Each structure stands twice: as structure tokens, then as C-alpha cells.
Amino acid sequence: MSSRNAKLLYRHLEAENAQDLNGTLATLHPDCVFQDHATGQLWRGHSGAADHYRQWWTTFDVTVERLADQSAGWPDENTFIAEAAWKGRHVGEFLGIPASGRDILQRFVVVVGFQDGLMTSERFHYDLASLLRQTGSNVVPDIGSLPYSIMSA
């Protein structure tokens, strides 16, 4: 584990949980890539990362937490893998589903890459159907038409 990367990750999570876009972007490499495997979306660069965070922050008022039964580790100095959870409330439209005001606790796995002292990638894996049920929906929407969809290409 690189202590520099661990400190950067901590700064990133503090900024992300505070919904501080400038602070969050300051931890990211200019060529960063974010991939949401559940929705099939891919964002590139600071502009894409900003859109990624805005999408989530206007939809869910959540913090990223690691629960007691979850683990994390560094398989090498430039890769961090963690089980974590989004904990909060559904406050805005998500995949065409209006804000429900419901509480959510969504477990996920994230793989984070590092290069040149910055985060280069985040790859998210989670159960979309579980998240949709927590918003009050049992219908999986057409995710191929989402902005940044890799499925519509």
C-alpha cells in the first residue's frame, strides 16, 4: 500500500461526502475514467467525472461508508478494492424514477486506480435491482439510453 495513495483516497472521500466538487476533482487525474457497471455508463476526464458526481449528488443525498462486515485492501500500491455502502436518501430523479424520499443503504464494490499521485479510475459494481427496489420501483428502466451509456454505442 502506498501511504500517499491512501492519504489521497481519504481526501477524496472527505470531499465526495461533503459534495465538494472542486475538492473531489482535485484528487483525480485529468485522464480519469469512471465506470458504473450496473448502469453501463462510462465517464472520462474531469468533465465526465463532474457529470458523474452531479448525477449522483442530485439523485441521492448519501455518504460513502464501510460497514462493519465489509472489507478493503490494496492488491498493489496503485490499486484499492473495497466493499462499501451508499447510505442516505433518494432525493432526485433516478433513471426516470421520481424522488421518493426513501432511505437507502446500497452495498457496492469499487476498484480504484492511482497514477502520478492522483486517482485514475473508479469502477463500481452493485445490484441495480436492489437500489431500484429501495427507491420504491420494481421496474428496471431502459438504461441503454442514459447519458454516457456504453450500451448505446
Language model segments and positions:
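C-terminal and inter-domain tail/linker signature
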Residues: M1-A153
